[in-house]
């Protein structure tokens, strides 16, 4: 099987995962009416999906070393597809939570890490790896940006249940395509799996995401959950230090956190997804609340961002040949900030919504330009035997960015509601995070890819 054909199932897997995370938002009201629950009940299912995926991403990634990357990919897809079918047939909220929140969450934690591990191992030079990550990251961005449009169209024209059946159909196709993938490194079932570390890291990440999701809802719970998360993660670091001293393989090696280049690139990854999901949330609320747009109209407006992501992702290989990865990350932040600036300058309450299109397009181009090199820098900073660990850590950081973007943007909107121009305040606040990301990118070395430890 050619490398290009191997890339197709990996990219489709990432598309499905990103689509699932964004398409539900436009179907909340229809789902709540159909299964006899409240909007809050459906939002709880979405929250539990995010929690399950975030908590299990690092343990799921580590399992790829023991059980094999291809095995984890296919099993993860199978679990995910089963969850999609269960969710499509759900008569009540409890069944929806089992299918969507639990099974799709567990499936995502198993199937997402192998995407990036296999891409890193199969494509072994900067240009080809940039092309691979460009396609994968492009599909991630398109899935996230086009999810509301596709979900809105299907929900309005047919039923929200069909969005889950569509996911199941794509997953079935990907499983067939994945059967011919050649895992470049055999599974090693003799490798130690750190169960205690998996529990501690999962619990710690669980409370981090819970705390983020409580921002703007209950300040006391935010503090309590962050303290719990800090305590569990500190216990986790003590645990892995103890295992390393005993010469036992931990869930994550402490040396992962000593790589300055990788650490900086993961900061940029986190902020990229924060900017993308945060700006998407703010602009969606603005269009629907202030402009009175429907879900379909809002989704159509976001095709500008989708087009920007697609254009920049398709150019990833050519850009990697001409510019250093660190330069592309910096350029991506600058373009994204320019897009936010255009939106603030042109998209006031009295202007035509068409004035938002240039800003959305620039945001899409900027995010698409920097996602690929950021992933490339992180994955390329470590040798093959560390790909399972760094992939899980990297995906967890990105998922945290997505959660933070929506939570922070929502909190700022609520806090600024009594003032004039709350949406402008929220977008300006996101721009400040973009400046932090740009500052982190400025400290990346000129040629970070290839510096492995």
Would you name each region that the model predicts?
Residues 156-269, 275, 293-294, 300-301, ...:
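Hydrophobic transmembrane-helix bundles of small-molecule transporters
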Residues 10, 17, 46-49, 53, ...:
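Structural signature of transmembrane alpha-helices in multi-pass secondary transporters
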Residues 65-196, 384:
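Helix-loop-helix hairpins in multi-pass membrane proteins, especially solute transporters
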Residues 23-38, 63, 119, 286-292:
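Membrane-interface helix caps of multi-pass secondary transporters
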Residues 47-61, 112-116, 303-315:
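Central cavity-lining transmembrane alpha-helices of secondary-active solute carriers
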Residues 27-56, 95-97, 296, 300:
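Extracellular/periplasmic helix-loop-helix junction of adjacent transmembrane segments
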Residues 3-26, 115, 158, 222-225, ...:
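12-transmembrane solute porter fold
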């Amino acid at each position: 099987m050619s490398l290009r054909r191997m890339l197709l199932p990996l990219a489709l897997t990432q598309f499905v995962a990103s689509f699932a995370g964004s398409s539900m938002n436009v179907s909340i009201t229809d789902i709540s009416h159909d299964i006899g629950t409240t909007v809050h009940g459906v939002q709880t299912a979405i929250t539990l999906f995010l929690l399950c995926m975030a908590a299990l991403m690092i343990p799921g990634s580590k399992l790829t070393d023991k059980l094999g990357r291809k095995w984890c990919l296919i099993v993860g897809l199978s679990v995910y597809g089963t969850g999609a079918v269960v969710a499509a047939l759900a008569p009540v909220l409890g069944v929806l939570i089992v299918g969507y929140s639990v099974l799709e969450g567990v499936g995502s934690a198993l199937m997402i890490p192998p995407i990036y591990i296999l891409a890193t191992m199969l494509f072994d030079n900067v240009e080809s790896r940039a092309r691979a990550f460009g396609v994968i990251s492009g599909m991630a961005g398109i899935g996230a940006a086009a999810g509301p449009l596709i979900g809105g169209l299907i929900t309005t024209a047919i039923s929200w249940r069909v969005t889950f059946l569509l996911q199941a159909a794509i997953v079935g196709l990907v499983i067939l395509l994945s059967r011919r993938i050649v895992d470049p490194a055999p599974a090693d079932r003799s490798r130690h799996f750190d169960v205690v570390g998996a529990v501690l890291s999962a619990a710690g990440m669980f409370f981090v995401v819970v705390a983020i999701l409580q921002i703007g809802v209950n300040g006391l719970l935010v503090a309590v959950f962050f303290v719990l998360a800090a305590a569990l993660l500190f216990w986790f670091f003590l645990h892995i230090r103890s295992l390393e001293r005993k010469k036992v393989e931990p869930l994550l090696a402490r040396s992962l956190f000593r790589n300055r280049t990788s650490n900086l690139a993961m900061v940029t990854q986190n902020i990229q997804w924060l900017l993308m999901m945060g700006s998407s949330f703010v602009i969606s609320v603005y269009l629907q609340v202030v402009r009175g747009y429907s879900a379909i109209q809002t989704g159509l407006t976001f095709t500008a961002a989708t087009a920007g992501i697609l254009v920049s992702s398709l150019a990833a290989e050519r850009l990697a040949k001409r510019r250093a990865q660190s330069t592309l990350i910096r350029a991506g932040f600058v373009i994204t900030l320019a897009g936010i600036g255009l939106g603030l300058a042109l998209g006031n309450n009295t202007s035509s919504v068409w004035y938002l299109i240039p800003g959305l397009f620039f945001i899409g181009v900027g995010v698409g330009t920097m996602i690929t090199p950021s992933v490339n820098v992180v994955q390329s900073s470590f040798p093959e035997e560390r790909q399972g660990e760094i992939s899980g850590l990297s995906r967890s950081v990105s998922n945290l960015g997505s959660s933070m973007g929506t939570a922070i943007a929502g909190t700022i909107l609520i806090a600024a509601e009594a003032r004039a121009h709350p949406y402008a305040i929220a977008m300006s606040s996101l721009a400040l995070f973009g400046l932090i990301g740009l500052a982190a990118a400025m400290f990346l070395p000129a040629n970070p890819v290839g510096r492995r430890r």
